[in-house]
Amino acid sequence: MTRMVAYIISVILLLAVMAGGCRKKLADLYYDPDQTVQPSIEKFFTQMLNNDRVRPSYWNVRTFVVMHTGIYTQLTGYLNNTTAYQQNASYTQDRWNDFYRPGTAADGGNGGIMAHYRLIESLYGSIQDDQQKTNATVFLMAAKVVMFDQASQIVDLWGDIPFSEAGSVNTSGDIVAANFENAANVYDAILDGLKNAALYFSSAQLPTSVHASFSKQDILLNGQFDKWQRYANSIRLRLLMRLSFVNEEKAKTEVLNILNNPAVFPLADGGANYVPLSTDILLQPLTTYVDDLHLALTEVFNYSAPDYMLNTVMKPVNDPRIPALFDKYGRTDGDQFIPNTDYNGLPVSFNAEQQQVNLGRYAILDSATFLFNSKLPGIVITASEVNFLKAEAWERWGGGDAKAAYETAIRQSITFYYYLNSLNTSTRMPLTQPAAAAIDTFLQSDQIKYTGTANQKLAKNWVQKWVHFGFLQSVQGWAEYRRTKNPALQFYPSTLPGYELPPSRLVYPSSETSYNANYASVKDKDMRTGKIFWDVK
């Protein structure tokens, strides 16, 4: 693939110039036009936010989501080819690269969360004037939140990762083969960092001109300190719940402290005032973006409605989200199009040939909401997820109304997907939000109603959160599926030896196995059947 060739070339160039040229090249990309001799922390910060691994870009969806996490979670439809569960080494190398280093000029220099963060650290450390340093702190703290959020996802995909030493060439100028750090320790560092960042934003005060500069460069939250605080606290809640089966005492103590002190630890939970655009943490597309996902989802036949989600979870309860998520579709017979009369997901029990010849008989992802929607935002975290997390915590440990949080999460999920549908006004008129009575009836159906044993209620919560994630958040969906073992998915076994079923982690890319001498410390556990530290259920 062209991006892999570009990567190989970039590695060669990196080895040639790493002693000094790498940092200079990055800095040259983002000179402040008002200060022609100093690279700009502000511009590096904006570049951290401008992330096509957060936005639903063609490349991320086509090469990572629909070939990896979407399949491993059954959040996308897919063909049961023999290689369906085999990791694509080139594409997962790309995913790794896009965290650790910026892209080439050919792909817009996108990505490089860790590299840009280290440059911000370095520039911040070089500031001598106390007032200037105080003013620059807001960019450093926001950059920390973004880096911690993205680093947690790399841990969730691979496990132990280079972290505290990663990108050190951009701070010290020294070439260091970064050690692989224990995943649990990385999580601890992330959790502490998120807490400190949230507390900073709770009381930060800046001169008007500095706040205006931050707002201008902040293409994620437009300089709103309250939302940065909620963002950091919400990601912290997500990660604490993720480790709650391996370190329940820590998770319980810290989560209940968050939930019992909403004035100190506000969350992006929305409550009765939920409006997706203003409540959720969403990365909007650039104003120049005109692409959509129809090629990413159709090139390898990933547009069919997932079997378990539609047939087992949603149809039996007449889920109000169905019209926003799916089209009934149809098939062509001669020159006549025969529309399907109902929503049905493509059976996962079919072999690949049966699936392909029958695609037209089954529902597909909604064309207005997903296939041809150029306005889809990148989803960082939503109020619905936050309330599902609150419901789980209160169900397991008490202290709040788990039922109310669960029902709020589902209501917000319905609103969210109709919001996504409403963003596309070019292919058809937006759908009307379901009536309140229809949603109330849905919430009282046996499969959805918050009744049963504690384990049954937790399972309902986890399944509904899985539905809410969908393919757009399949990285989170895969993490939660492995953590909770819900829903109870069945996979069509592949005949390819060693790849009969989906993996429980990604194996490390060749950039680490071939060029990082410290890979030896993790080599023995670098197996697709290995487990991330929180995967103990």
Regions flagged by a language model, labelled:
Residues 1-31:
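Bacterial Sec-dependent N-terminal signal peptides
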Residues 22-80, 111, 125-130, 489-537:
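Membrane-proximal, proline-rich intrinsically disordered regions
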Residues 79-164, 168-204, 208, 373-378:
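Conserved, well-structured interaction surfaces
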Residues 188-270:
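Internal, well-ordered domain-core segments that constitute the primary functional module
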Residues 218, 251-390, 395-464, 468, ...:
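Hydrophobic-face positions in mid-chain alpha helices that act as interaction patches
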